[in-house]
Amino acid sequence: MKTKAAVGRAWGEPYSIEELELESPKENEVLVKVAHTGYCHSDLTAWKGNYGLDILPVVAGHESAGIVEAVGPGVTDLKPGDHVVSCWQAPCGHCEQCVSGRSYICENLIPSLGSGKLNDGTARFKDADGNEVNHSLYVSGFSEYIVSPAIASVKVPDELPLDQACLLGCCVGTGWGAVVKSAKVQPGESVAIWGMGG
């Protein structure tokens, strides 16, 4: 299928709006029509090339929410029409940590996060010349449609506005972790926030 996307072809240069070919979801993947995507400071850092990744060309954006259009083989917990938040972490499901119930420390997560590929080592986007265009953190929310791992697509209630839901994929979790886990802020305490995002 065709999808319009903002493609990064050089660090620090404007994104080009391109029509890409998007492959159908493979096993344990979903096709999502993106409704809203936030622009995190991590997206700006990546756009500048400050992460040192070799993933160009790439469709960026990792804070998105949308509606499931199709599911690949093996997907049982999502169906077309479900509202989802796309998460930038997709544990592999088969390493020792994952099978032990500790997918939050998946052994394959960090290497695959910076690869520009999905869990099977390939990308689903192709440009007009048939060349692969990489994914950003499994999400690539700066596209009308995305294919991502089902494990990285979290169902949310239909009544939750998707323009707010997209923030759950990164900034809410990051902010929550900083406040609750790191700073251990207690009810009634005051805090100051100097900046958010990567």
Predicted segments, located by residue:
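Extracellular beta-rich ligand/substrate-recognition surface
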Residues: 7-14
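Glycine-rich beta-strand-centered segment in the early N-terminal region that forms part
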Residues: 21-37, 50-99, 104, 112, ...
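Cytochrome P450 core scaffold surrounding the K-helix E-X-X-R motif
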Residues: 42-48
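Glycine-rich phosphate/pyrophosphate-binding beta-alpha loops
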Residues: 42, 85-89, 170
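Cysteine-cluster motifs in flexible loop/terminal segments that predominantly coordinate metals
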Residues: 87-151
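Mid-domain Rossmann-like dinucleotide-binding core that forms the NAD(H)/NADP(H) cofactor-binding site
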Residues: 144, 151-153, 157-198
